[in-house]
Amino acid sequence: MATEPAAPNDQQAASNGDWLSLWKPEDPVFWASTGSRIAWRTLLLTTISLVLSFSTWFLLSALAVNLTGIGVKFAEDPKDNDRLLFWLVAMPGLAGGTLRVIHTFMIPLFGTRKVITVSTLLKLIPCVGIAWAVMTPGTPYWIYMVLALLLGMGGGDFSSYMPSTSLFFPKRLQGTALGIQAGIGNFGVSLTQFVTPWIIGLAAFAAVTGGPQGLKTPTGEQSVWLQNAALWCVPLLIIIGAVCWMQLRSVPIKASFREQLDIFKDKHTWFCTITYVMTFGSFSGFAAAFPMLIKSLYGGFGPDSPKPLAYAFLGPLIGSTVRVLFGFVADKTGGAILTQLAGIGMIGICVAMAATGVLAPTSLETFPLFVWLMLGMFFFTGVGNASTFRQYPLIFAHNPRQGAQVLGWTGAVAAYGPFLFSAAIGETLGWTSQDGGVKSALPFFIAAAAFYLFAVAINWYYYSRNGCERPS
């Protein structure tokens, strides 16, 4: 009686220490004996690294609200200073999106082990640099801008993590694996916004960095070590970078740069890009802008004004949690219908914000409603983030390599969310407050609703309706 040949064990599959010699996740025998163990180990390590990536990428969103308080001013006029702070928060998004375009092509060229390890360790540069900048009085704006661009490395490598993970898992588990990794990775946004107000109050690195700064608040002055916001993840980056180098392996799917350009000939690459800008672009954009948006709209009402970081972390926390949970739901229901519902929900939130006046407040009375509506927006972005990543491998099921690259490419374009949202909101607030007018973010949210409507229409026509071109 013939027997199935034994699948290679872990060591045989990674005989050269980097590239796996064989990878067949769709083969039940291989998956049960070897593939599952390697894939889940890879998912664990790369997800931890991705959490740190998001934490560093959104570092300035948590730091910017306190820079003025310690005496860091880039303009004498408060309105101009706020606008410059919004641009500072936007820069990691600009760099992150651009670097994601590059990362889209890196896994087939260099493999998971090299790309993830190097990108993890590179983030040490901006973290140490930001700590130095806040400890050095008189650091010019251009240096902060350069460091902000370098923080974009934390956003750029997402487009290597996602294609890598999709290659390690069989199609039936891709939605779950991608949802777990992206969702838990997104927790890095909440982590940095939650940890910052706590750790800057501790002399955790004082032996190395020296004394505190004086932070002026509406209720007085307090001592803070603002550099700690950038330093807490430094030892973690070193540790996880070393572990990734020792433990990760690479799937033997290689393609030249020229071969990989074929994804741009498929119209569905561009349609997927639009729907992911709606979901992840909005999640990352609002996550970056939320603290400064709270400060700009509701920070001018005296001692009772809300502390932005007491609320800002809740949005990314909800969006990240929902993304993880709805990854499982999308595997059962399909992604297209959930993307449709998420987009409709986001449009509804924009309409509610426009109708209730929370975007142009004249008192703190509307602040609770504003927070609840923003949390609702994060909820729907989380649903959409999970569902779209379930859709894309199915839309490109005919070519797994293309499907993996589309995950990277869509993530690259959507990573411009922090740049586009922060810059656009900052300019909108500056424009509406000219000549003594009330600050308002209403024009931005009207434009966002129009774009969401366009994305929902594309998703319905090509992926959701009966008889659509590529059901997903």
Predicted regions: what is each one?
Residues 108-120, 331-346:
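Cytoplasmic membrane-interface "Motif A"-like loop-to-helix N-cap segments
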